[in-house]
């Protein structure tokens, strides 16, 4: 969940988001060390009075500043490739949900169940109840079982959209005529909010996403009541 004036990432709720948070910290530390080194060298150049006007080349220095950046790039690329593989790979999903973007709402279809589908519209500000969040609440939440791998198939009926839930580490483009895939998995129950993250028209800001992650038994009871 996001908070006012928040500067950091949202709390990780899925294994993928935990990996992304660790990778963010790993990369940020490398960037911080490089920036510190560069600023230190610049300060030395501005303050020292010693110069080497006769130096034409420095083979050792050139070797270092060629090899060192290559090593740094490898240290960044290896964990990045691992996370990319984890985000794309899904074996034996417990559930498949088809998500379609529209101007300006989402529709969901539980493909493992017959006739379990619905549209999800934003609740207008005037209809909100005490404690509900402005521009983030919907009339029909996506109820999913926690601690199970779930495959989301994402596409669009009209223009480009993007289905994003930050606390789960999800952001997948919804493209007309193309079916994209994302993996949803939550470590704990709760409500997780997202929004369309691709400018899709005048009401782009009014396409919220609400995932309600519940234990498997509650999900089975809910799905039985919806059919």
UniProtKB/Swiss-Prot annotation:
One of its GO terms (cellular component) is respiratory chain complex IV. The keyword Repeat does not apply. Gene3D superfamilies: 1.10.287.90, Cupredoxins - blue copper proteins. Binds a dinuclear copper A center per subunit. One of its GO terms (biological process) is ATP synthesis coupled electron transport. Cu cation A2 binds at residues 196, 198, 200, 204. GO terms for molecular function: copper ion binding; cytochrome-c oxidase activity. It is a multi-pass membrane protein. Residues 1-14, 88-227 are mitochondrial intermembrane. Its cofactor is Cu cation. The keyword Metal-binding applies. It is an enzyme of class 7 (translocase). Its EC number is 7.1.1.9. InterPro entries: CcO_II, CcO_II-like_C, CcO_II_C, Copper_CuA, Cupredoxin, Cyt_c_oxidase_su2, Cyt_c_oxidase_su2_TM_dom, Cyt_c_oxidase_su2_TM_sf. It comes from the Eukaryota. It catalyses: 4 Fe(II)-[cytochrome c] + O2 + 8 H(+)(in) = 4 Fe(III)-[cytochrome c] + 2 H2O + 4 H(+)(out). It is found in: Mitochondrion inner membrane. Component of the cytochrome c oxidase, the last enzyme in the mitochondrial electron transport chain which drives oxidative phosphorylation. The respiratory chain contains 3 multisubunit complexes succinate dehydrogenase (complex II, CII), ubiquinol-cytochrome c oxidoreductase (cytochrome b-c1 complex, complex III, CIII) and cytochrome c oxidase (complex IV, CIV), that cooperate to transfer electrons derived from NADH and succinate to molecular oxygen, creating an electrochemical gradient over the inner membrane that drives transmembrane transport and the ATP synthase. NCBIfam families: CoxB. Belongs to the cytochrome c oxidase subunit 2 family. Component of the cytochrome c oxidase (complex IV, CIV), a multisubunit enzyme composed of 14 subunits. The complex is composed of a catalytic core of 3 subunits MT-CO1, MT-CO2 and MT-CO3, encoded in the mitochondrial DNA, and 11 supernumerary subunits COX4I, COX5A, COX5B, COX6A, COX6B, COX6C, COX7A, COX7B, COX7C, COX8 and NDUFA4, which are encoded in the nuclear genome. This is Cytochrome c oxidase subunit 2. It comes from Hybomys univittatus (Peter's striped mouse).
């Amino acid at each position: 969940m996001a908070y006012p004036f928040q500067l950091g990432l949202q709390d990780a709720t899925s294994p993928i988001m935990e990996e992304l948070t660790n990778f963010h910290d790993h990369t940020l530390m490398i960037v911080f060390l490089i920036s510190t080194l560069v600023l230190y060298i610049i300060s030395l150049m501005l303050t020292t009075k010693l110069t080497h006007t006769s130096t034409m080349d420095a083979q050792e220095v050139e070797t270092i500043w060629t090899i060192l950046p290559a090593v740094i790039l490898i240290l960044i690329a290896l964990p990045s490739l691992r996370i990319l593989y984890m985000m794309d790979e899904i074996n034996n999903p417990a559930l498949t949900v088809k998500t379609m973007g529209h101007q300006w709402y989402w529709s969901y279809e539980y493909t493992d169940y017959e006739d379990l589908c619905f549209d999800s519209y934003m609740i207008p500000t005037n209809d909100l109840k005490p404690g509900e969040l402005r521009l983030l609440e919907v009339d029909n939440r996506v109820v999913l079982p926690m601690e199970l791998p779930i495959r989301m198939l994402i596409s669009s009926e009209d223009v480009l959209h993007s289905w994003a839930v930050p606390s789960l580490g999800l952001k997948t483009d919804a493209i007309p005529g193309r079916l994209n895939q994302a993996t949803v998995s939550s470590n704990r129950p709760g409500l997780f909010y997202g929004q369309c993250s691709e400018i899709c028209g005048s009401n782009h800001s009014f396409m919220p996403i609400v995932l309600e992650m519940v234990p498997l038994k509650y999900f089975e009871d809910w799905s039985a009541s919806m059919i």
